[in-house]
Amino acid sequence: MAMATQATLFTPSLSTPKSTGISIPWKQSSTLSFLTSKPHLKAASSSRSFKVSAEAETSVEAPAGFSPPELDPSTPSPIFAGSTGGLLRKAQVEEFYVITWESPKEQIFEMPTGGAAIMREGPNLLKLARKEQCLALGTRLRSKYKIKYQFYRVFPNGEVQYLHPKDGVYPEKVNPGREGVGQNFRSIGKNVSPIEVKFTGKQVYDL
């Protein structure tokens, strides 16, 4: 059975502009031509062309010793004869997502959009319409195949934003130095009485 494949070609340039579009600092090839080649069968990717650029952001510092991986545009896509549902209209006006991973062998896996595909031995790249689809596929890759993954957001203007795992360690793992968000080191019984914060605009866990 013939299988359709996705292929993308990027042409990196030498300059690297700066922007505030990325949540952590990193540098990548500044301008890349995101072109989708025409496959033999109907492929899941769109034939529109994109310019992909990666910028650095200094507002949030990355943990020491961690350098976010660069998105390699020449990475081949898994072999898939079905459709990922397209990139939706949102990809033209907002963004789409790219997940990458490296497989030790060629093996079959379940697509988050339905159906089965064959991941290639070595690096794989898959474009999806939603971040949740990347998370669903990534969870499956880690739980069943013991494969690490990364995914990125690509904006219509070509900007690439590295998303996950943000500090190099997946969130369900303990990472020394990672700061907790919304932590209160007390039991719920030690919260103040709700009547004391009524109409103040605050919550009992804020005090």
Swiss-Prot record:
Its main location: plastid. It is found in: Plastid, Chloroplast thylakoid membrane. GO terms for biological process: photosynthesis. GO terms for cellular component: chloroplast thylakoid membrane; photosystem I reaction center. Gene3D superfamilies: Photosystem I PsaD, reaction center subunit II (3.30.1470.10). InterPro entries: PsaD, PsaD_sf. The keyword Mitochondrion does not apply. The keyword ATP-binding does not apply. Residues 1-54 form a transit peptide. It comes from the Eukaryota. It is a peripheral membrane protein. Pfam families: PsaD (PF02531). Keywords: Chloroplast, Membrane, Photosynthesis, Photosystem I, Plastid, Thylakoid, Transit peptide. Belongs to the PsaD family. PsaD can form complexes with ferredoxin and ferredoxin-oxidoreductase in photosystem I (PS I) reaction center. PSAD may encode the ferredoxin-docking protein. This is Photosystem I reaction center subunit II, chloroplastic. It comes from Cucumis sativus.
